[in-house]
Amino acid sequence: MKDTADITVLGAGSYGTALAISLASNGHKTLLWGHDPEHIATLSRERCNAAFLPGISFPDCLVMEADLGKALAASRNVLVVVPSHVFGDVLRQAKSLLRADARIVWATKGLEPETGRLLQDVARDALGDAFPLAVLSGPTFAKELAAGLPTAISVAGTDAGFTADLVELLHSPKRLRVYANDDFIGLQLGGAVKNVIAIGAGMSDGIGFGANARTALITRGLVELSRLGEALGAQQATFMGMAGLGDLVLTCTDNQSRNRRFGLALGKGCDVNTAQSEIGQVVEGYRNTKEVFTLAKRLGVEMPITEQIYAVLYQGKSPLDAAKELLAREKKSETAAAD
């Protein structure tokens, strides 16, 4: 089937729209699909996503499409940018509509709800093994990406040719640097765990602990990410790159991060429901915490920071008590195999 677009983006939220804008700004004809026809009609009419990215106009070669079948028929390259808790549902909905030569990449960050499985496993369950898969991950705030501010990300996949094509599609000398990576597992994991640690960093700052505590939490959070990655067969070098340290620092230190702002509200005394309402958008880290906690328990990986954040979100523990428990833990060597 002949392409009528270079790539189709599924998901018209802030990040999906930002990626679509970036792709179209490279001169690629890009189709942006969303599940709400009224929202897509508004985007098409106003030529911007005023709700999430106000003041940023769409390039001429960015086209809206409310019909999923038409969107998937337009291009073999499909970029999925939906929340992790609906990722599997969207792929199952898409399966019968995908072209035989389709190639699937996602920028969704998270794990499968309840089970803690990697999204590669969710994708294979939904689609089978016929399609090349890839993941896009790294330190990216949607507003900055959409505005064309310099950004760097990583991409990894099951097919080297697909990965190379994605680098060519996404890379822009003026706005976006894209690094190829061969660690498919590591890139998926980094995007989920950093959301959890960002909530913890926000809690710490909300309590008023300061920069020293925040930096310690980020550093030990990176240890937890590396430890979980090792158990899953990821490459440790990945966690020192864009999808590990890069994304972790970004989300833990800047208030553009919904996860960090959520943690800040909790640290200042808000309950979970109030804190989520204040954000006004999906806080991926809330679900990610349960998913990462579940995965770590299943694999027998010790992740004390994650455990305390889970206790705050799902067991009613106060952020201050969680912090006190972390500080009171038995003294250990920094370089010991388990902390």
UniProtKB/Swiss-Prot annotation:
The record's listing under Gene3D superfamilies reads: N-(1-d-carboxylethyl)-l-norvaline Dehydrogenase, domain 2, NAD(P)-binding Rossmann-like Domain
Q: What is its EC number?
A: 1.1.1.94
Where on this chain does sn-glycerol 3-phosphate bind?
109, 138, 140, 194, 247, 257-259
According to its record, what are the GO cellular component terms? cytosol
Keyword terms:
Cytoplasm, Lipid biosynthesis, Lipid metabolism, NAD, NADP, Nucleotide-binding, Oxidoreductase, Phospholipid biosynthesis, Phospholipid metabolism
Active site annotated at which positions?
194 (proton acceptor)
- Give the principal location in a single coarse category: cytoplasm
A Gene Ontology MF term for this entry?
NAD binding
Q: Which residues form a coiled coil?
A: none
GO BP annotations of the record are: carbohydrate metabolic process; glycerol-3-phosphate biosynthetic process; glycerol-3-phosphate catabolic process; glycerophospholipid biosynthetic process
Q: In which pathway does it act?
A: Membrane lipid metabolism; glycerophospholipid metabolism
Q: Record-annotated residues binding NADPH?
A: 14-15, 35, 109, 142, 258, 282, 284
Which SUPFAM superfamilies does the record cross-reference, listed alphabetically? 6-phosphogluconate dehydrogenase C-terminal domain-like (SSF48179), NAD(P)-binding Rossmann-fold domains (SSF51735)
* Catalysed reaction equations from the record: sn-glycerol 3-phosphate + NAD(+) = dihydroxyacetone phosphate + NADH + H(+); sn-glycerol 3-phosphate + NADP(+) = dihydroxyacetone phosphate + NADPH + H(+)
According to its UniProt record, where is this protein located?
Answer: Cytoplasm
Could you name the domain of life of the organism this protein comes from? Bacteria
Q: What does the protein in this record do? A: Catalyzes the reduction of the glycolytic intermediate dihydroxyacetone phosphate (DHAP) to sn-glycerol 3-phosphate (G3P), the key precursor for phospholipid synthesis.
Fetch the NCBIfam families from UniProt: PRK00094.1-1, PRK00094.1-2, PRK00094.1-4
Family label: Belongs to the NAD-dependent glycerol-3-phosphate dehydrogenase family.
Name of the protein this chain belongs to: Glycerol-3-phosphate dehydrogenase [NAD(P)+]
Query: Upper taxonomic classification of the species?
Result: Bacteria, Pseudomonadati, Pseudomonadota, Gammaproteobacteria, Alteromonadales
